[in-house]
Amino acid sequence: RAEDVQYTVDQSDTSTLIFNDKSGPIDYAAMVREVGAEWPKVERMVVLGDDRPDGSIGWSEFLAAGTTVSDETLAARSAAVRFDDPMIIIYTSGTTSLPKGAVHNHSVIRNVVERTQMHGVTVDDVHAGYLPLFHAFGYTEVALFTILTGGKTVLFETFDAEAILDAAETEGITFLHGFDTHWGDFLRVNAARPRQLALRLGTLA
């Protein structure tokens, strides 16, 4: 994994690296310490968590720096963006070689907006976030769904059907997303112990 992180950060010309210090069993801070010296183009690192590699700053410091950017500058930068400008590079898992970057432009946002309208997503919806956010499915159907509608996401570090359905009951989760294995686990564990759920929609990829 450290080799993949080293390659993708360097190959994408990343200048700002934002990461959790740890997520589930993965120690990202340790990875950065191991390979970070190989990133001459990285100008700043922002860490969510207490384990911060040398030269990095915390999330609150990063947000505070935004107060130095004027509304006029922000508006000018926003106006300069075209729909066909690159927005995100999502990398493959690199199962046969090094990860390959798939470039998506800003029209992705319009596509996601249209899906939220089709599904009737509102600010009152609550999503369960257990899909990897560096994959297209998790990024669009969970992260962007929430960002574009102002809803809420309950994040999980790993997939655990029992824990997710328990949280769905207590947090009022209305949306679940997943693959056939996710849904198979959900159906199995809920049949064994039914919950009072507020679910109204699920997506299957």
Locations of the language-model features?
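Short coil-to-helix segment of the ABC ATPase nucleotide-binding domain corresponding to the Q-loop/switch region
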Residues: 105-106
